[in-house]
Amino acid sequence: MALALCCMSHSPLLNLPGPSRDLLDDIDAAIARARGFVEDYDPQLVVIFSPDHYNGFFYKVMPPFCIGSSASGVGDYGTHAGPLDVPEKLAVDCAQAVLDAGVDIAVSASMDVDHGTVQPLEKLFGTAISRPVIPVFVNAIGVPLGPMHRCRALGAAVGTYLATLDKRVLVMGSGGLSHSPPVPTLATAPEPVLQRIVHGAPMTAEQRQARQAAVIDAARSFAAGDSALQPLNPTWDHRFLEIIDRGSLSELDRWSNSFVTHEGGGSAHEIRTWVAAFAALQAAGPYETTMRYYTPAPELIAGFAIRTARPK
């Protein structure tokens, strides 16, 4: 058994017009460093904790956590469309181990995943299907949300199971850090949008194009300082990164959902995927972060971070 970790932010704007060449070059250079770490490790299995943006999970049934025993990319924002290489038996065994550890988790035999899962895989491996992958959905936008300590418990249970495998496993977390992009909510969404976020009504090509244009416009306004969206919070981002860098994950148990929203924004709850991933790594013992990157990126409407880590 061996474990290693790579966590990174994601953004649809990495695949869209708008961000400056300097910013993209800086992020690409950081991703290349992370890619080198992963290539040297050469994982035989990837387990990725990731959120969803109303592409695979909807309010009709919104589990806090779900493991996919089969999964397909929906192809949003130019990412991979089609099946992922999910080892079904390992995924089901992992789900059983998590349940046995006292963490209630759903299982999907047909999980749809979006750019939150696929983009980091493509950035690290070139394609989303180059390695066997077990996707673990972590709800980060569909309120009510559970407490942070349950995300840590989820990760610890997954990591304990992975420690029983005779494989090199890369654990990933996708999302964050501080950001509050325009995301529909039950309280504010108009009826057509409610049909989508509650019942999963499919989007037409025209609707997807309109959403993409809206994201580009929102980022342009945000970067220009002409936006009502909640500002990024680099101070809070660095506080979070410092906690995970020193392995003090239990400190995050005290971070209430209202605190995360107030400090980091409505979508900052994606840090839950990082908490789960680092808890999975920590289940194998103390760890050290080996590559650290952070930049506040208004052009992406996100505090963009990358970490790699391995056991000490």
Curated annotation (Swiss-Prot):
The protein's matches in InterPro entries, at most eight in alphabetical order, are given as:
DHPP/DHXA_dioxygenase, Xdiol_dOase_suB
Where along the chain is the active site annotated? H115, H179
Q: Which reactions does this protein catalyse?
A: 3-(2,3-dihydroxyphenyl)propanoate + O2 = (2Z,4E)-2-hydroxy-6-oxonona-2,4-dienedioate + H(+); (2E)-3-(2,3-dihydroxyphenyl)prop-2-enoate + O2 = (2Z,4E,7E)-2-hydroxy-6-oxonona-2,4,7-trienedioate + H(+)
Q: Name one GO biological process term.
A: 3-phenylpropionate catabolic process
Cofactor(s) the protein needs: Fe(2+)
In which domain of life is the source organism classified?
A: Bacteria
Keyword Iron, does the record have it?
yes
The catalytic activity of this protein is classed by the Enzyme Commission as 1.13.11.16
> So what family is this one in?
Belongs to the LigB/MhpB extradiol dioxygenase family.
Annotated keywords? Aromatic hydrocarbons catabolism, Dioxygenase, Iron, Oxidoreductase
Give the enzyme's main class according to its UniProt record, as a single word: oxidoreductase
What Pfam families would the database entry show? Answer: LigB
Its quaternary structure? Homotetramer.
* Record-given protein name: 2,3-dihydroxyphenylpropionate/2,3-dihydroxicinnamic acid 1,2-dioxygenase
Q: Pathway, according to UniProt?
A: Aromatic compound metabolism; 3-phenylpropanoate degradation
What GO molecular functions are on record for this protein? 3-carboxyethylcatechol 2,3-dioxygenase activity; ferrous iron binding
